[in-house]
């Protein structure tokens, strides 16, 4: 089963709020997911990001591929560097 770490949209109209989830690549954007690993709120200034770091690193270690947007968020949070350092 191929998995991705991606954003699932929540919140009201014109005020998006995103859950950072691990989901099967075949499931819909806001559909079934395996695990919730964090949140992203672009409405705050600066944007608020919360990760469960241990779960995120665990899924990256299992081979879950982050989308481009999630990868940028991981880099800003400093989690991507920890993953790269562990895998080297």
Curated annotation (Swiss-Prot):
It comes from Geobacter sulfurreducens (strain ATCC 51573 / DSM 12127 / PCA). The gene is rpsP. GO terms for molecular function: structural constituent of ribosome. GO terms for biological process: translation. This is Small ribosomal subunit protein bS16. It comes from the Bacteria. InterPro entries: Ribosomal_bS16, Ribosomal_bS16_CS, Ribosomal_bS16_dom_sf. One of its GO terms (cellular component) is small ribosomal subunit. Belongs to the bacterial ribosomal protein bS16 family. HAMAP family: Ribosomal_bS16. Keywords: Ribonucleoprotein, Ribosomal protein.
